[in-house]
């Protein structure tokens, strides 16, 4: 009797993560954009400066039947999507998709992969510079969409347009730049892409 009860209670619990994963994967499409709250050392400063919960992002691709996130970390790479999700705070994420997904034809998706491939293995850009020597997460997504699809997800801002007043932000700026803060540097933030009217939400946890 106890064995039957244990099976009745425990089996559904063991199957829940698998079922949840399957539901997410059934909703995904190549080229979707995924956001989460990073637990990195700089995440809090990004959130304060941009006034957004979301401090990290990437592009979703399917490879050999499995889903990955193409992301700018150290270095730029493909990460299995469930590893990527669990790396974020509390396993929370939001997936967004182009409002007009028909734009992402097979040819455009091939161009997106090709555009992203030139960044593979490049170091993460701690200084948020707009050149391609190093790359940060939202810069990677923005440049891939711009080059391959001609779409600008969110508007570029100069560094001075962010809220740089919080002590945690000022400390991170001093750590990175010293006294020479590049206030005119063009930047694309995760929040700018998250708020883009070209995207619609399709999943979250």
Question: What are the roles of these predicted feature ranges?
Answer:
Residues 1-2, 16:
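Generic N-terminal leader/processing signal
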Residues 16-205:
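Cysteine-nucleophile amide-bond enzymes
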Residues 3-11:
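Sec-dependent signal peptide recognition
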């Amino acid at each position: 009797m106890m064995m039957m009860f244990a099976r009745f209670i425990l089996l559904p619990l063991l199957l829940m993560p698998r079922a949840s994963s399957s539901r997410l994967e059934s909703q995904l499409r190549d080229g979707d954009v995924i956001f989460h709250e990073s637990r990195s050392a700089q995440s809090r400063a990004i959130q304060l400066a941009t006034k957004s919960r979301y401090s990290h992002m990437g592009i979703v691709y399917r490879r050999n039947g499995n889903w990955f996130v193409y992301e700018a970390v150290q270095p730029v790479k493909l990460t299995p999507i469930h590893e990527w999700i669990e790396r974020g705070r509390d396993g929370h994420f939001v997936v967004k998709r182009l409002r007009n997904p028909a734009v992402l034809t097979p040819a455009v998706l091939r161009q997106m992969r090709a555009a992203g491939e030139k960044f593979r293995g490049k170091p993460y850009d701690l200084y948020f510079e707009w050149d391609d020597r190093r790359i940060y997460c939202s810069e990677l997504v923005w440049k891939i969409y711009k080059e391959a699809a001609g779409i600008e997800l969110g508007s570029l801002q100069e560094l001075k347009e962010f809220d740089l007043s919080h002590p945690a932000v000022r400390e991170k700026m001093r750590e990175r730049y010293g006294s020479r803060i590049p206030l005119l540097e063009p930047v694309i933030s995760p929040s700018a892409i998250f708020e883009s009217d070209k995207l619609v939400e399709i999943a979250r946890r």
